[in-house]
From Swiss-Prot:
Protein name per Swiss-Prot or TrEMBL: Cyclin-J
Protein's organism: Mus musculus
InterPro entries listed in its UniProt record: Cyclin (IPR039361), Cyclin-like_dom (IPR013763), Cyclin-like_sf (IPR036915), Cyclin_C-dom (IPR004367), Cyclin_N (IPR006671)
Pfam families, per database record: Cyclin_C, Cyclin_N
Family, as annotated: Belongs to the cyclin family. Cyclin J subfamily.
Range of residues in the leader sequence: none
Keyword Lyase belongs to the record: no
Record keywords: Cyclin
Superkingdom of this protein's organism: Eukaryota
Positions of the Cyclin N-terminal domain: 15-143
Record carries keyword Zinc: no
Length: 379
């Protein structure tokens, strides 16, 4: 988005953030009761791919998926109609978030492969009727905050020159910010794929994406005081969401390794987070982010096998998410008034449907030590 749309850089950033936090308290409840819940992942990925095709901004993409989730939660919709609903949600979201020139045109939508493969043709009248039904369903209110609306504001303080990487001062602050943004974007897409993240407030998901990125990049302290103040979330309130994100990252890494035919001993080297000071210099390599054509968002950071041997295993210690990061617990004792607690979470818990096709294949464990591949920094 252009500079005029970057509200997080302006003088009113704090006020806008507070307004968004207030609005998210009034978000509609999501029950996860759609009969087509097993198709939700496909259509969420479809929206993501189409939005990338038209270079729509992340808030438009996330708003479109959120509109689709709420609409599917209330209606029993056929597969053919779901294509129409998904594209209509994307159109409404793009009209709300983007400039007029960026909104996809009818002929462009009809030329999409998913439409031709299904022998579907959208008409202007059909789209208008569906948009009207969507607007009436949401009571003409599209100002629905998502995690993408908060992430840039939190990223503005996600990396600071006082942060340490594996106990060492950072050499290149701008490069670190670049990789922080890339990982935060990846975790945002992870949260978009699983409806279970609707059980958390959007601002909490955004904060967890930043925290997860800092863990992957081995920045310390993991959740500094400035981020506690900025987000109004303490570490303990983020842990559960962080674990879901890191579990998805773990599965993506394993799947990428499996596709490359890597052996099990190589995969098991990706098991611990570094918290101790390194004994020798390490090097920074750039991860790649690809959106697969099969409507599966994979994290191919593991597709560079040489990176598994970059990090020394002689100076590692396990990082347990259950406890507060070292040096942080005592520094935030006076910030209790910033905590939002349960009030920032959605009121209705998500029902786990047995027909859901989820990307996670392991049970949730509070003490899990999550595997990851970590880009390292030049010395």
């Amino acid at each position: 988005m252009e500079l005029e749309g970057q509200w997080w850089r302006g003088q009113l950033a704090a006020d806008i953030h507070q307004a968004l936090r207030y609005k998210e308290l009034k978000l509609p409840s999501y029950k996860g009761q759609s009969p087509q819940l097993n198709l939700r992942r496909y259509f969420a990925d479809l929206i993501a791919i189409v939005s990338n095709r038209f270079t729509l901004c992340p808030p438009a993409r996330h708003l479109a998926v959120y509109l689709l989730d709420l609409f599917m939660d209330r209606y029993d919709i056929s597969i053919q109609q779901l294509h129409l609903v998904a594209l209509s949600c994307l159109l409404l979201a793009s009209k709300f978030e983007e400039k007029e020139d960026s909104v996809p045109k009818l002929e462009q939508l009809n030329s999409l492969g998913c439409m031709t493969n299904m022998n579907l043709v959208l008409t202007k009248q059909t789209l208008l009727h569906m948009e009207l039904l969507l607007l009436e369903t949401f009571q003409w209110n599209l100002c629905l905050p998502t995690a993408a609306h908060f992430i840039e504001y939190y990223l503005s303080e996600a990396v600071h020159e006082t942060d340490l990487h594996d106990g060492w001062p950072m050499v290149c602050l701008e490069k670190t910010k670049l990789y922080m943004a890339k990982y935060a974007d990846y975790f945002l897409e992870v949260s978009l794929q699983d409806y279970a993240f609707l059980n958390y407030a959007p601002s909490l998901v955004a904060a967890a994406c930043v925290a997860s990125s800092r863990i992957i990049l081995r920045l310390s302290p993991t959740w500094p005081t400035r981020l506690h103040r900025l987000t109004a979330y303490s570490w303990d309130f983020l842990v559960q969401c962080i674990e879901r994100l890191l579990l998805a990252h773990d599965n993506d890494v394993k799947e990428a390794n499996k596709q490359r035919g890597q052996s099990a001993p190589q995969s098991t080297q990706l098991t611990v987070f570094q918290t101790a000071q390194p004994s020798r210099p390490v090097h920074f390599q750039q991860p790649q982010y690809l959106h697969q054509s099969s409507l599966q968002y994979r994290h191919p950071v593991s597709e560079q096998p040489s990176r598994q041997q970059i990090v020394s295993t002689t100076h590692t210690s396990s990082y347990t998410l259950q406890t507060c990061p070292a040096g942080f617990q005592t520094s935030v004792q006076g910030l209790g008034h910033m905590q939002t607690g349960v009030g920032m979470s959605l009121a209705i818990p998500v029902e786990v449907k047995p027909c859901l096709s989820v990307s996670y294949n392991r049970s949730y464990q509070i003490n899990e030590h999550f595997p990851c591949i970590t880009p390292c920094f030049e010395r």
